[in-house]
Amino acid sequence: MAKKNAQIPSKPLEQGIVPPHSLEAEQSVLGGILIHPAHWDSISDMLIADDFYLAAHRVIFQEMENLLRQGKPIDLINLYEFLREKNLSEDVGGFAYLAELSKNTPSVSNIVSYAAIVRDRAILRDLISVSNDVAQSCYTTKGMEVKDILDEAERKVFAISEKRTTSNEGPQNICAILEKTIDRIELLSKTEGHNGITGVSTGFDALDKKTAGLQPSDLIIVAARPSMGKTTFAMNLCENAALKSDKPVLVFSLEMPAEQIMMRSLASLSRVDQTKIRTGQGLDQSDWSKIGSTMGLFANKPNLYIDDSSGLTPTELRSRARRVYRENGGLSLIMVDYLQLMRAPGFADNRTLEIAEISRSLKALAKELEVPVIALSQLNRTLENRADKRPVNSDLRESGSIEQDADLIMFIYRDEVYNENSEDKGVAEIIIGKQRNGPIGRVRLAFRGQFSRFDNLAEQRDIRDDY
């Protein structure tokens, strides 16, 4: 059954202007259901009662839904008696109007087309209503900053879109699903060179074997305590995707300026000590040659976008991601550093609900654009009090919603951070705490902090040879 979405405001439109509507389409939808009640299932996912312009039509549609909820069939007599018992029959024109709806419906077989007309007119009215709200906010700001008014306007427009967007076509017969599945398997089996990687390669062999790559529409959480290297690890994933994929990578760096991110990437790909790059001191001819080679890689394939705006809202981030997506015909990967630095207007008094809204919006973005979204996250300090300081899912700060929304959760643990005499110096564990469509477990990587780089554990070759 269709449900009303309370996010869409119900405001009166400007007086003297008739809002978009089609009484004929509304009558044909209602009449079609009365003539052939089975058609309810064809249109109930498309419409809600508030989509009807005429008040009587809203009542009729709502009471049809209520009839079905009580397990009663929809027909002329049942509906009329149901309305009469609630003292609503006269509000809809009585039995005569219901009979007229049944009599004057042009073609029951076209009911889906009529429903689409009703839905589209309702969307136009929603847009007009939101526009009026925005105009009113602009005339009387009530102390709001322009940035907040703009964010609220975009949120309301997106709410209309989100209300109407469905992620699938409803129930499908297993034969149709099986056919698509076999086609997908056959395509993968005939594609050479993917080595079982069905998503965006991480650049790390052992991790790719565990995950089959970073999958489209997945929300991927990378979490660690400070100094473990979560930004370095996430940027390594982005660098690999940017240089190997046909479509660009978009990085939202809410904590670090774009130039610092770029310095880290130069150190990572050039294998030049990042302290030399950061200070400009001690660089020899060999270092400059390596840096020049890396710059050539980016010049030949400028596939990395960095937005270092701080305090982004989900609406702002989504808008910017859509723009880059549209301008480039797609994206291969989105990374957010880090989730807790985002803000969601309207949730200032409840941090848990704010994080839930941010997490939900990032997952929605991944599904909308069909792109893997990596979000870095902080961990609770309480794990520092344990003997085994390897993170688990419950260590995620404001963990409930993040853990629920994530498709893949990866923690970074380096024993040498806690144990000065560790036998695993220069080794990092990538702990897969959750994987919706794959195994959990651990992967060991080499950590080369001076280069701002993680590597396959036994790897000593020059990574630039890959690109």
From Swiss-Prot:
The alphabetized UniProt keywords are:
ATP-binding, DNA replication, DNA-binding, Helicase, Hydrolase, Isomerase, Nucleotide-binding, Primosome
Q: What is its EC number?
A: 5.6.2.3
| Keyword Nucleotide-binding in annotation | yes
List ligand-binding residues for ATP. Answer: 224-231
Q: Which GO terms describe its cellular component?
A: cytosol; primosome complex
Drop me one GO molecular function for this one: DNA binding
- Fetch the PROSITE patterns from UniProt: SF4_HELICASE
- SMART domains, per the entry: AAA
Please indicate if the UniProt record lists Isomerase as a keyword.
yes
EC class (word): isomerase
Question: What is its quaternary makeup?
Answer: Homohexamer.
UniProt record similarity statement: Belongs to the helicase family. DnaB subfamily.
Tell me, what does this protein do in biology? The main replicative DNA helicase, it participates in initiation and elongation during chromosome replication. Travels ahead of the DNA replisome, separating dsDNA into templates for DNA synthesis. A processive ATP-dependent 5'-3' DNA helicase it has DNA-dependent ATPase activity.
Protein name from the UniProt record: Replicative DNA helicase DnaB
